[in-house]
Amino acid sequence: MEKRYKEILLTNEYGKLLEAKKKGIPAVPCLPVIYAENPITAGNEKIMAKEMDLSGYPYVLEQEEEVEKAYLEKIRCRLLGLPCEILQTRRCIVREICLADVDNLYEIYADPSITLYMEGLYAKKEEEIAYTRDYIRYQYGIYDFGMWIIEDRQSGEVIGRAGLDLRPDREDAELGYMIRKNRQGQGLAYEVCTAILAYAKEEFGFEKLFARTRKENLASVMLLKKLGFHPVCAQSETKEADNAQIEYYIVLP
């Protein structure tokens, strides 16, 4: 069996998998994998089965299963190192980050108001690039979600970030968001976050999400309340009361 999805080869023949690997063609094994369809070599299948190694293939499909086009597209993006599109709203596209976005992020984070209530980027761009490369490989590759890029649907301009993050001590995910200074006040964060809440429930089965913000960050507080979040408690209380974070939660319908 041999099929093509755009640049991706899908086959149950081990010989064709090896050939594709030599040529640099991204391929996906389809179970059950045999050594070859050729009846002349088919008699060696039992011997060859011991030598077949599929450990280097991050995706393996069942030959008979019906695979949705959206899943094949995600596999394609993963194998080719392309950012997957997550969702679209009326004005925005939400997609995974790629290394080409790093320059845009430094431009956005250069405005002091962006880092007033959140961490900035690495001081050295090469460190941010290395971090982003690992984030793509491990965060997206393992969990299939994370912080994403927000693009303007019409212009393609990177206008912010939003997404879901996991904390080591929590089972529920944290909602995060950031819109560049010159695009704030247009309802974009609400538009994108509303779509992400629905996506979190539908795609990953999250029943509850949380978010944290500083109490003096009134725009963020108002956004969370508008989204339906409820305050839990103040965290990280110190002598500097202004540094206290308030945690909010939402039970997804």
Predicted regions and their residues:
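Conserved glycosyltransferase catalytic-site signature
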Residues: 13-14, 144
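A short helix-loop-beta-strand connector motif used in the catalytic cores of GNAT acetyltransferases and
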Residues: 135-149, 160
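Repeat-unit-sized solenoid/scaffold elements
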Residues: 130-131, 135-137, 184, 188
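Hydrophobic residues in alpha-helical segments
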Residues: 109, 118, 139-141
